[in-house]
Amino acid sequence: MEMSKFLESRREALKLLGAAPFVAAVASAQQSGPGQGRGGRGRGATHFEGPPTPSPTAIPGGKPLLTLYSISLQWADYDEAAATAAEAGWHAIGWTVRGGGHVLPENVARDLPKAVAAAKKAGLQVPIIITPIRDAEVQYAETYLDTMSKLGLRYYQAPPLGQYDYAKDLQPQLDIWKPRIEALEKLNEKYGTTAVYHTEGGAGNIGGGGWDLWLAIKDFDPKYIGMDIGLGHCTMKGGPEVWELIRFTHKSVLSIACNDIRWVKKTDPPKGPRRSDPSQDWPWTAEYVIPGTGMVNFRDHFAYLKSIGYAGSILHYSEYFVDVQGASQPISILRPNVPKDMPKDLYVSNVERDREFYARMLAEAGF
């Protein structure tokens, strides 16, 4: 049966995930000598600090960059979007460089420099851009990478690898991507750029749980191919302790996308957007919520990122809804029409609160 093959592959991955902290601890003990192994941490259980090798994004003494995803600023031009992000205290902005985004694919050579200049004018960095490039055959792919290289940009978010066909064997559906990813790796090597594939939750998405995405990319050089771990999306797939996935995939984790979710009964009154489920009669579903009010274990995620020297982007990806006075229904914080649907000061106060939450979690993690 196809599902049994899928579950067998997943079990193998999870066995490795479970072994990873132990392997890291043994390696550390061998390096340190008797009695000098790495200590544990956490509440009620031992949490090994993980492998001592820094992540590829590590900057000596550096900290993760709190980065606002510009999809929530589509109502503003480059200058206003960057100024608004800075007003809310963000360190950086992740421009949408795709259809319907701030920079359109056909205009990337002309307009991406303008967007980067606007960010710099506002005192923001641009550690990552969001693109449609999942392989080397995507239209304008080489123009994207050439422009990024000239601007000194390294990382771009790549979209998920499509949808599973559950009527067919699943492993070949991962394997078919490997030559395409290899071609993109070579293109990235040419331009000094790096693709980070996003773990998009939801039924049927290839790579949505993280473990299967890692199986697709694990043999590629993390200088050029990596993962953008969506903490909320992976929690949606695996529960609050799925953060331990990062322990096994740490060399490939080059970007972190943050949102928060909780599991709710479908009969509960909705407080935010919900994901569809593979089984429509299943009573539980996932709902997006304000960061810090859901199931995502930000504390332990960030503590582990600290232990591996992570200094990449923390990309704010929240998809919760906001109550607006006079509105007939809550408004999405992900795609608000400001000021028509939501006053600008209300938008700013929400994303500022979110930034303060992430900053507090990073501080508690020792950053």
What positions do the PLM features span?
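Histidine-acidic metal/acid-base catalytic patches
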Residues: 2-8, 12-33, 40, 44-67, ...
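Active-site acidic/histidine proton-transfer and metal-coordination neighborhood
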Residues: 17-18, 22-25, 80-82, 125, ...
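Hydrophobic faces of well-ordered beta-strands that scaffold small-molecule active sites
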Residues: 64-69, 93-95, 126-131, 156-158, ...
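Active-site mouth loops of central-metabolism enzymes
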Residues: 66-76, 130-138, 171
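Active-site beta-loop-alpha junctions enriched in small/polar residues
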Residues: 71-73, 98-100, 131-134, 161, ...
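Catalytic domains of carbohydrate-active enzymes, especially glycoside hydrolases
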Residues: 81-98, 151-152
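Glycine-rich, proline-tolerant flexible connector loops at the mouths of alpha/beta enzymes
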Residues: 96-114
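Alpha-helix-loop-beta-strand connector modules within alpha/beta enzyme cores
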Residues: 112-127, 184
